From Swiss-Prot:
GO terms for molecular function: phosphatidylinositol-3,5-bisphosphate binding; phosphatidylinositol-3-phosphate binding; protein-macromolecule adaptor activity. Disulfide bonds: none annotated. It is a peripheral membrane protein. It is found in: Preautophagosomal structure membrane; Vacuole membrane; Endosome membrane. WD repeats lie at residues 1-34, 69-114, 139-182, 185-225, 230-269, 317-359, 367-407. Residues 267-310 are annotated as: Disordered. The N-terminus might form a beta-propeller domain involved in specific binding to phosphatidylinositol 3,5-bisphosphate (PIP2), leading to the association of the protein to the membrane. Pfam families: PROPPIN (PF21032). Component of the PI(3,5)P2 regulatory complex. This is Autophagy-related protein 18.
Amino acid sequence: MNFVTFNQDHSHLGVGTSNGYRVYTTDPFNKQSESREGDVSSLEMLFSTSLVALTLSPRVLRIQNTKGKRHSTICEMTFRTAILAMRLNRKRLVVVLESELYIYDISNMQMLRTEKTSPNPNAICALSASSENNYLIYPLPTKAAPATFQPPSHAPPKSDHIAPTSGEILIYDATKMEAVNVIEAHNSPLSCIALNNDGTLLATASEKGTIIRVFSIPDAQKLYQFRRGSIPARIFSMSFNSTSTLLSVSSATETVHIFRLGAPNTSRSNSISSGPTTLLSTSHQRSSSRTSEDISDEFGSSTADMAASERKPLNPTFASMIRRTSQTVGKSFAATVGGYLPSAVAEIWEPSRDFAWVKVPRSPNAASAGPVRTVVALSNNGPQIMVVTSEGNYYVFNVDLEKGGEGTLYKQYS
């Protein structure tokens, strides 16, 4: 299995293999279409239509109509470098290369724009499923410093951009074809981003993977901050449910976290570390955002480390006392105390843990093969979470939305 993905409304699941691809419905789980031709490294579906975009070789993209037994090719394009990802909605096709984005009008496959990016080997990019809020999100390009010497004529051309050193995000209007805002989401480079169905919320995670943040789009206000854990782990996948009340997050830890999105305290979020409301932010906003993440991450890590090393329950450390207190403190008390603390420190007191989670089973032979990659989606038909693993397993877990806690395995397919 080369690749796996859900479509925009999580009703279909696409799998790319070295011998073609398969498309399944998720509820009930049935194979809808397949092709046994080509080495498919990635694919994207357009909702529940018969249109599928395929990457058949590192540089070749094919748009196919899967209706009927004979799949017809609508168009085929070859790019200068390897295709790392594709994004689709009813208006746009975005092709992600390592240092470029190609944006097409999906109605006639006319290329509208090419955007230069910083090196983006992990294809960090999200396109809204909504045609009205048609936003494209990717890491803010960072210009390289001017060369101090003239390279020899035979040397290959150097990129105008360098790899990002922080988690700044560009919000791009894919209808008007213009940048509209910038979010300073994290101090570390990004590892994963996800948009909700309406194109109004953006979830972000950095390479540390300890803090998940949710911003409003396009005004870039920080609405929620969640803590996945204290130990850094790479975030593989994030997904909102259809009503944007839940956010699921999978990582290299084999635990899938589910966070509840209640009514955000926007006035406080805005005053603490909201993103800039214009394309250029002030130096004060930059400093505040980065300082808050540093303190929040360091607080969580030091607390976990001290609690783990302290083995004398009759003489608890100050850190372990704070840890227990923070788990039981009420929301009203946290909000009151937060009002008197500096903005960077106030975020520590916010109750931001997951309310539910599931444990992804591992096969016995996978223990020495490193972390199992997972892709997650929340079902539109009930309180369930769907998880697909790089081992080729598809799991459906039931989640208790009232009590939370650990979800139970409901179905499993291989």
